[in-house]
Amino acid sequence: MSSSSSPFFHPPPQQVMDDTTQQSPSYSQNSNSPSQHTFESMEPAAGGSTSMRYSPSGSSEADNPTLGLFSAQASYPYSLRKRRPCLTKDEDLCFPITAATADETPQPTMKKFKLECLSPGEARDFSIEDESGTNLEAKMETTECEPEEEEAVEEEDQQDHINRLPEELLLKVFSFLPDKSLLACSSVSYRFNQISNSHEVWKELYCNLYDYRIPLFHPSHAKFEFREQSRWRDGNPWKESHRQLHHGVHVMKEPRVNLRSVNYRCFDQIEKAQSFLEEDEYREKLIFLHTGVHEPIDTILINTDVQIIGASDSRDITSSVVLEGSKNTALTFTDGSANAYFGFITVRFRADPVCRQQPQIAQQAQQMNHFYSILVTDKDAMPYIERCDITSKVGNGAAVCVKKSAAPKFKYCTVLDCENVGIYITDNATGHYEHCEIARNTLAGVWVKNHANPYFRKCTIHSGKDVGVFTFEHGQGYFEKCNIHSNRISGIEVKNSANPVVIRCEVHHGYTGGIYVHERGRGQFMENRIYANAYAGIWITSHSDPTIRKNEIFTGQQGGVYIFGEGRGLIEQNNIYGNALAGIQIRSQSDPIVRLNKIHDGLHGGIYVHEKGRGLIEENEVYGNTLAGIWVTTGSSPILRKNRIHSGKQVGVYFYDQGHGLLEENDIFNHLYSGVQIRTGSNPKITRNKIWGGQNGGVLVYNGGKGCLEDNEIFDNAMAGVWIKTDSEPTLRRNKIYDGRDGGVCIFNRGKGLLEDNEIFRNAQAGVLISTESNPTLRRNRVFDGKSAGIEITNGATATLEENQLFRNKYGGLCVATGVTPVQRGNRIYDNHDTISRAIKTGLCLFKVSSNNSFPMHNFYRCTTCNTTERNAICTNCIRTCHRGHSVELVRFDRFFCDCGAGTLERHCHLQNVPRDNDTVYDSATPISTETGTEI
């Protein structure tokens, strides 16, 4: 009987081949459709084994004689004949059985011949014969099928022993078959197809061959990814992974025989595997380096697109597969390695044990040569190095060296515990370094020099015994989203005209500074977070000129940005806060541009310019700092323009010890001390600023301070708008000083200066108060609408008053105390309210006019009968009324308030309508100078 009549075989392909032809099955993506499998011819290999070799997809046997296990150009392995229908006595035809599955098999029309399946969808192999061996199919062409013959057929049908075997037993049998036989079995029957494509069978084969415990996805050259079974689109990930990897050769410390793969090749040295692959141009260059420590005789030289990947049954494959060099560089990539791959391997260099035992020899060897764990050199060296652990235990040479325009790609690698530099990139080399960890190296984690320009992204560089990243001698580089921390010296050091880009990195917890730019270093540092460093977050020195933009610099144990030694740079749009010292320091003739920053909540000052520092400081917001918002001292002369300086816990802007510079168009407000303080020889120019809300006045000039204040608005300060005291001599010109809660300008303690063309109005006390031996010059000022006198001169002071206008002041235009003789020329005093004179005329106590908020100037007396002291003063009307008949004496014409009316004497004032308690009287408080010293 023809096998084609059996329902246990699938329909053959159109092409019919000779049964004697030797065939090998091929791999198909659809493991559930045996009719789609094809086969190819096999040539016996040396030693009697069948040799399977890689062939590019789509090539024919004629084009490539090396067609192998998974070729798609083979044919069906059996010679099959066409099926004939079963004839009946009544000349009715049975339905031809055209499908191998029960779902597609129609029922016969005759009861006398019925096919029974063992199970739905299960294919079977049997023949139908009578007792004499005559083929029943032929007999049925002319005779009727009898019941006895039908019973014989059923009895014979029950003899299908193979298909009646338990599935566990078949799985056990299949677990011993090689991949070639498994693929062949998949075309025998549906049941064989299911079992030969089961996960258990292919997983055991896969693990024995590759040692992996997770399927390795290898869709294209130099791309490898371990994927859990649930992430594979194919039905059998183990089988699919084997299809992708079966062309590879294996390197083991102790090569083993594996009979389950027809393509299996195993060597004990990487060099031998490389030589084998170079001889076969059609075979994929793929090497599996298995568990163990592999010690090459000399450097492993890679100048092709070979792929080398670690293979181990350990969860940590990388640490289980070690390539160790001891006499020379362990691994070198040169020209031709543009598409090479190296992954999941530990690479390390250790000195030869003989050299280690003889230190002198080791020292001489190190002086003569540099040794590396991995060396990538020359222009066309562009390997992909992935998930490797790299270290070097010699003091002369980096773990990784990239030079001479090489451009490798390192990804998910570690470079740890090296005795020298971690990664050394030089001589115009580039490359990509992503998701790497570089840590605990004796010298810098990364060296970049000689115009090298690598790309680092999402790397962690930490715990080094030196610098984290060191760029020097025109080195460049792009560092993005790296985490650089806990290095003994700076996180990043830029030197000798190096010019890197550092963007969106974190630089923190350095044992010294965060970023150190010196010796004409440059660089662009943008959108980084720089914090918790022991020294300054960023140091710029010795003619360096970096760009610092949009960074967060905070909680440093010293300052935020420190610029000295004639440093320059652009510091722009940064958020600098919470540092132990000044947010920005500029010293020793440095001249940066500082603009659009927020500098706030520091434990020290905001910006500190000293030791002849300069710089353009504009459009910054400086607030909430413990000490002065901006300090300018020791010969410094910065330009401070359009800044907003506010809410400080001391002074807004503080010039001292020969501090100079230009303070222009700034908003300075709401400080606990003065808005601006000038002292000890400082001589800034302060122009077009708005200064308000100072709790200790607007501007305080003292201790020999100078300065030129022009065109400013000084208003709404708790004390005087401008204080001039202790031998200070500023120039005030064209300012508007108004709405002060004390006087407009107060000049004390030998204060001098020139007040010219100012408008002083609506202040709570005198527009200008001159006292205690002071001698200023007032020229062409307008003092008006004051709630006290326009100008008051008292206590031994004098002044030169020229062409001033004093009008609409409450107590009078000009009030001069006894013994004061100012120089007056061309002043106009008019339309003042003269409230004091009117009160005297109407018999009012002057305290009724002034209360305890101001000090009217008039004749004041003391009463000897009431035992008043020199500190007490009584107005004229109280002497006439309350102390009539007492012994009194004139004190002087001066600024007092009436103690009788204030209720501070034992006698009750008869001129007060209601009793008053002894409120604390008010006097112009002494201005508070900053407690900050001259040293940080």
From Swiss-Prot:
Compartments in which it is found: Nucleus; Cytoplasm
Biased composition (Polar residues): 48-63
Protein name: F-box protein dre-1
Pfam families: Beta_helix, F-box-like, zf-UBR
NCBIfam families for this protein: para_beta_helix
Protein purpose: Substrate recognition component of a SCF (SKP1-CUL1-F-box protein) E3 ubiquitin-protein ligase complex which mediates the ubiquitination and subsequent proteasomal degradation of target proteins including blmp-1. Promotes ubiquitination of snail family proteins ces-1, scrt-1 and snai-1. Heterochronic protein which is required for the timing of gonad development and epidermal seam cell differentiation. Regulates tail-spike cell death through inhibition of the apoptosis regulator ced-9.
Reported tissue expression: In mid-embryogenesis, expression is most prominent in epidermal and intestinal cells. By the 1.5-fold stage of embryogenesis, expression is additionally detected in neurons and other cells. During larval and adult stages, highest expression is seen in epidermal seam cells and hypodermis. In larvae, strongly expressed in the P epidermal blast cells and descendents that give rise to the vulva and weakly expressed in the somatic gonad, including the gonadoblasts, the anchor cell and the distal tip cells. Some weak expression also seen in adult spermatheca and uterus.
Ranges of residues in domain F-box: 159-205
Lineage of producing organism: Eukaryota, Metazoa, Ecdysozoa, Nematoda, Chromadorea
